[in-house]
Amino acid sequence: MRKETLIGLAFITANVIAWSLRWRMQKSTTIAAIAGCSGAATFGGLAGGIVGCIAAGILAILQGFEVNWHNGGGGDRSNPVKRSSDSFSIVNHNGEKVDSYAHLVPGKVGKVIIDNIELSAIRYANNHTSLGYHFTSDGSGPAARGEATTIWGVGADEAIDKGTPSKNDLQNMSADLAKNGFKGHQGVACSTVKDGNKDVYMIKFSLAGGSNDPGGSPCSDD
């Protein structure tokens, strides 16, 4: 296995361990992003830097999912619960803060802010929500959409009503993504969190420069 790949996976493993031990201070994901993007790029070159950024993006997205599940306000609920955490917020395309993914205007690009890390957010007509973590093609840090490679996490909003994944489920999902890597023409990794025999949430990460619709990525719903 190439040196930069090993370094990138080491950053992912470190992030997963830190997350599972609840080393989740206000600036934890910012530190992870700095370590993943600059550290891996320094020691592992281009590929290592990109994989390190992916690690930070996965960590931030998973933390956001946990906050969403545990504090409510997801899906199509008529009375969404306001979040108590100052480290998590959802902002519509016009800059207005909203209480739920369900309040995002379909097709418009809003954002989710988790511990000062911004993720782009799009709600589709089928009520699926995509979260994107943008970083430059050289892995040096966040970038504008036009010059960024994007990681997308995809899942159905209504899944929040089917059960709450455990922390172990989320940790296993991140580990599964790290283990399997990014495959296929667009570099796709998929994982499903399950509650008993029911599929609760499928997350799909796709490296696709300039893409803002991950729906065509080859992930199975099984």
Curated annotation (Swiss-Prot):
InterPro entries assigned: Killer_tox_Kp4/SMK (IPR011329), Killer_tox_SMK_b (IPR011327), Killer_tox_SMK_b_sf (IPR038431), SMK1_alpha_su (IPR048754), SMK_a (IPR011328)
Biological processes, Gene Ontology terms: killing of cells of another organism
Extent of the signal sequence: 1-18
Gene3D superfamilies: Smk Toxin, alpha chain (4.10.420.10), Smk Toxin, beta chain (3.30.44.10)
Disulfide bonds: 37-53, 190-219
Family matches, as Pfam families: SMK1_alpha_su, SMK_beta_su
Source taxon at top rank: Eukaryota
Keywords from the named record: Cleavage on pair of basic residues, Disulfide bond, Glycoprotein, Signal, Toxin
Glycosylation sites: 127
Gene Ontology cellular component annotations, sorted alphabetically: extracellular region; protein-containing complex
Molecular function in Gene Ontology: toxin activity; toxin sequestering activity
Oligomer and partners: Heterodimer of an alpha and a beta chain. The fate of the gamma chain is unknown.
Other known facts: The full activity of this toxin depends on NaCl or KCL. Its maximum activity is found at 2M salt solution.
Job description of the protein: This toxin kills sensitive strains of yeast.
Record-given protein name: Salt-mediated killer protoxin 1
Protein's organism: Millerozyma farinosa (Yeast)
